[in-house]
Every structure is written in C-alpha cells, then in structure tokens.
Amino acid sequence: DTGHDSIRNGVFFLRDKLEPDDFIIVHDAVRPILPRKAVDEVIRVAHENGNASSSIACHPPIVYTDDFKSGVTDVDREHVMLTASPQAYRYSLALECYEKAEKENKHQFTFTSSLLIHYGHRVYFAKGTTSNIKITKPEDLALFEALLSIPEEKLYS
C-alpha cells in the first residue's frame, strides 16, 4: 500500500466514528522527532481554517529539472513552503476529498494536503520545525541521533 492508501483507509474506517466537524491528524512514522509545540500549532491553525500542514519557509535555492541531470529554470523560493506532517483536517473535508479521489481512481497524492489542493481547497500553513526530519536513508540516522541530544524546547521556538 502507498501512503495515500493508508491515509484513505484510515479516513474511511472513521466514517461512523467521527462527526463531520471533528478533526483528524496525520503524521508520518518516519518523522519521530516532533516537538509538542509543533503539534499544538497544527491543531490551532486547523481549528481556525479547517486544515493545516506543518510547514517551513524554503531557504535553499531550488532548480526545476526535467531529466535530473541539469536544471532548466530556478524556482522563486519566496513563494515556496516546505510541508511535512503532521497535518490536520476537518474530518468532513478529508472524507469528501478521499471519496472523490476514489471515484476518479486517483491515488497519486502522497499528502492529504496535495489532495485538497487538487480539489480546489486552500491549504493553511502551521509553523513547523527543521528538526522534524524524515528518516529514510542510513545517513539520516546520524542526524536523528544528534537531534536526540538537543532539548525539545530548543527544537521549536
């Protein structure tokens, strides 16, 4: 199963268990360093706007490529946010989008936020943290171990 399938299955499982105005929070298990303040911020922004995605401003230069060998244009990073989990959604909104995607056989969306955008919804940003790293490669473990030695209050300010 893909990440899309896992989240969709969870959303569909909750059909008779949640009220439409309840919220769900989605987080990647491969992102184990998550300060409580980051979760609180996602919840706060979601309650204000119906959804929220943990996000940070993009600082490194970004270049668009069509072949992964060379760059064809740079991307204005002043208008780019890096999003990650946790993400929170009003349950009725998530359910509506996953039901549409299921009917249209669209399963390419890794994040629910991408699905919302596809169906014309605005996604709101909650202040994230660079310490919320995704551990997918062996070298990520060294960074993870180093981050474990930093007090939580210094990981999110």
Regions found by a protein language model. Give the residues of each.
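Short phosphate-binding loop-to-helix
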Residues: 1-20
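Short glycine-rich anion-binding loops that position phosphate/pyrophosphate groups of nucleotides
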Residues: 1-2, 29-32, 130-131
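Conserved strand-to-helix beginnings and helix N-cap segments that scaffold or border functional pockets
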Residues: 7-8, 36-39, 138
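Residue-level signal for inorganic ion chemistry
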Residues: 10, 28, 57, 90, ...
